[in-house]
Regions:
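Short linear motifs centered on Gly/Pro in flexible linkers and helix caps
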Residues: 13-16, 323
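N-terminal secretory/targeting leader peptides
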Residues: 24-117, 126, 133-335
Length: 335
């Protein structure tokens, strides 16, 4: 009898030990499309991973995969999450084809004043249901945008919209490409890693991008900088919904506590920090930062208004709430 009781106790202890060990063996895979020393890796992914590990007392580990990995393709981040190749991914909306089209309204010209307000406005649009079901297959951890993108050229001085005619620009997404074509410029879509080679080879004359960009040697070639609020880019951080729902309740609560609105609010300070070195570099001799006066800025707005109207009209064929989403964003960001 004692022997049986001892064996049962031993088995119970073994099972409990195995259960506790299993509870500590949660590893989440988190990917993004930039390099291992990029600001996304060092300031976004790694701190969040460490915070989650701390909040779960070490039960959850996060394994990170950057853009040099087999799951680091810029066009594949959301697909990899949905397919279960990774559990979490940070991706660029404009690289995802027809995914998340409703979110593209925030990328239109002269809408976003800065990364903080733009990110919070996009997150609010998601939370209140305006974006419909475009993220229904995912657990959304954050949505954010960068500070307004501007026009940079090697030597072409651009003051008025008419000055854009015939100039070849690297464009970051289709929204910007439509604006460039409307102004008579020639948009060229290039992956991040190919941009500076195209500049050096004379294949493009300028770049439309924000200050805090991952382009190495950017200020060595781009000498003129025209500060128009030409566009912004939307980004997402999403998690595999099945993975999230399979996690213990306390782990889900830990993820929720460091995601959503608190995480979104960090991207304003993040982008200000990431912008500063490049913006400061543009103060060096040989550079000129051109800030259009109010009258000139209004001419830019008027020149690009038809682009916004046409884009929303086309977008409505796939995302019926396009105009309503844009109007809500515009009203929010005017406040």
């Amino acid at each position: 009898m004692r022997r049986s009781a001892f064996i049962l106790a031993l088995l119970a202890a073994t099972a409990l030990g195995a259960s506790n060990a299993a509870a500590q063996e949660i590893t989440l895979k988190f990917s993004h499309f930039l390099g291992p020393k990029s600001f996304f890796q060092l300031d976004v992914v790694e701190p969040w991973a460490k915070e989650l590990e701390a909040k779960t007392n070490g039960r959850v580990k996060v394994e990170t995969f950057d853009g040099t990995s087999t799951v680091g393709g810029v066009t594949d981040q959301a697909s990899n999450v949905k397919a279960g190749k990774v559990d979490i991914a940070l991706g660029l909306r404009g690289a995802e084809g027809d995914k998340f089209l409703g979110s593209s309204v925030i990328e239109l010209p002269f809408l976003v004043p800065n990364a903080l307000r733009g990110s919070q406005a996009l997150w609010a649009l998601y939370k209140d249901g305006t974006l419909g079901e475009e993220y229904k297959d995912y657990k959304v951890l954050a949505l954010f945008v960068h500070n307004p993108g501007l026009i940079h050229t090697k030597d072409k001085r651009i003051l008025e919209p008419a000055d854009m005619k015939g100039v070849r620009f690297r464009s970051p997404n289709n929204t910007v490409s439509a604006a460039l074509r409307h102004l008579g410029a020639e948009p060229v879509l290039l992956q991040v890693n190919d941009v500076m080679a195209a500049v050096k080879d004379g294949k493009i004359d300028g770049i439309v991008t924000n200050w805090g960009n991952p382009l190495q040697g950017f200020n060595d070639f781009m000498k003129l900088h025209i500060e128009t609020q030409f566009y912004t880019s939307a980004f997402f951080i999403v998690m595999n919904k099945q993975t999230y729902e399979s996690l213990p309740t306390d782990v889900r609560a830990a993820i929720d506590s460091i995601s959503g609105e608190p995480w979104v609010a960090k991207f304003g300070p993040y982008w200000d920090k990431w912008d500063k070195p490049v913006r400061d570099g543009a103060n060096a001799p040989g550079h000129e930062v051109i800030v259009p006066h109010a009258g000139r800025m209004e001419r830019w707005r008027e020149a690009l208004k038809p682009v916004t109207d046409q884009y929303l009209e086309e977008l409505a064929k796939k995302f019926p709430g396009a105009r309503a989403a844009y109007d809500k964003l515009a009203a929010t960001l005017r406040q």
